[in-house]
Amino acid sequence: MSNETNCTLDFEQSVELFKEYNLFITAFLLFLTIILQYGYATRSKFIYILKMIVLWCFWPLNIAVGVISCIYPPNTGGLVAAIILTVFACLSFVGYWIQSIRLFKRCRSWWSFNPESNAVGSILLTNGQQCNFAIESVPTVLSPIIKNGFLYCEGQWLAKCEPDHLPKDIFVCTPDRRNIYRMVQKYTGDQSGNKKRFATFVYAKQSVDTGELESVATGGSSLYT
């Protein structure tokens, strides 16, 4: 007699297993749906951070499953496919960390490790505060606004701010470039004429270099003139 045990599930066992864990599966899928659908920095920072954590977990999970597939391949063809996919997952994960670390060295912001983007916007206020925000791509124009004394850019709340705190230049950093935006227009005041209550600023892309924000912050007061 064979001592091997058949570990495969038949249809009825699969149905029973689903019935037993269907509540957990429903809750898990609902959690993923909410995270992926509503996880935007402009809506809720908390849900957005949860979304980032979920995305971070996907790469190690893919690598782990790939390694298991290499250890227990269904056949020779499956082994080759598992090796290729696992190597691709490992290279992609390493590439993500390399690019994120390069971006972090350039702008010193934890947004550098955002798996959705390889760009970070930075506004160095004249009061010494640095405001960083997530941005999906390098735009041609940036339009930060001040509403009720709070600074917003790309729909994201950044800091408590007054109109005269905005600098002449703001930046969007990528792993290999620093994009410089210069203020070209400024509108202050609301319908009541209160210039501190509402303000709109227009920054146009001026130049591109390979500098870091730290060199700008310590380079003198010319940035704020």
Swiss-Prot record:
Record keywords, A-Z: Glycoprotein, Host Golgi apparatus, Host membrane, Membrane, Transmembrane, Transmembrane helix, Viral envelope protein, Viral matrix protein, Virion
InterPro entries associated with the record: GAMMA_CORONA_M, M_CoV
Primary localization: virion
Transmembrane segments: 21-41, 52-72, 78-98
A molecular function (GO) term: structural constituent of virion
Impact upon substituting residue 35 to L: In strain: Isolate IL/2831/98 and Isolate MN/6370/97
Effect after changing residue 150 to V: In strain: Isolate AR/6386/97, Isolate GA/5658/99, Isolate IL/2831/98, Isolate KS/5425/99 and Isolate MN/6370/97
Keyword Transmembrane helix tagged: yes
Top-rank taxon: Viruses
Subcellular location: Virion membrane; Host Golgi apparatus membrane
Result, substituting residue 180 to T: In strain: Isolate IL/2831/98
Pfam annotation, one family: CoV_M
Topological region Intravirion: 42-51, 99-225
Recorded GO CC terms: host cell Golgi membrane; membrane; viral envelope; virion membrane
Membrane topology reported for the UniProt record: Multi-pass membrane protein
Keyword Transmembrane: yes
Segments on the Virion surface face: 1-20, 73-77
Annotated function: Component of the viral envelope that plays a central role in virus morphogenesis and assembly via its interactions with other viral proteins.
Oligomer status and interactors: Homomultimer. Interacts with envelope E protein in the budding compartment of the host cell, which is located between endoplasmic reticulum and the Golgi complex. Forms a complex with HE and S proteins. Interacts with nucleocapsid N protein. This interaction probably participates in RNA packaging into the virus.
HAMAP family recorded: GAMMA_CORONA_M (MF_04203)
Protein family (similarity comment): Belongs to the gammacoronaviruses M protein family.
Record's protein name: Membrane protein
Gene it is expressed from: M
